[in-house]
């Protein structure tokens, strides 16, 4: 009987320990939501500059078009807002064969990220930030390559934020 109880306890522990959690991060769909479609361009905007170049040259309140890859940290998306960080495509992210569970955090090249990262917040026509999850709203995910159009703002440390009115998601990237 003790053996049977012990086996039952082991099986119960296994079943409970391997259960799925009800709490999960929103995931991207391959398409933007109906609410997000108004912010997503169907053709790629011309003359996009990489994030690193934009950080060097963009002036405060200047209209910009830049290209980057979503990432830069383990959590590049801002909870509750359609906002995220992008990194210059020239900065390599960790590859699958390096065994990195979160290659979008650029843990292998963090020294290169600082001068090649920008924050993107999707805004409406009045410049008000859009609430919701960017993954669902825009159909993006970590390491998606995006082309952003919007207005640049700079802080005292030289950080670049873009109030984006248009987002183009490069297919297959």
Positions of predicted regions on the chain:
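OB-fold and OB-like single-stranded nucleic-acid-recognition modules
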Residues: 18-173
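Sec-dependent bacterial lipoprotein signal peptides
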Residues: 1-17
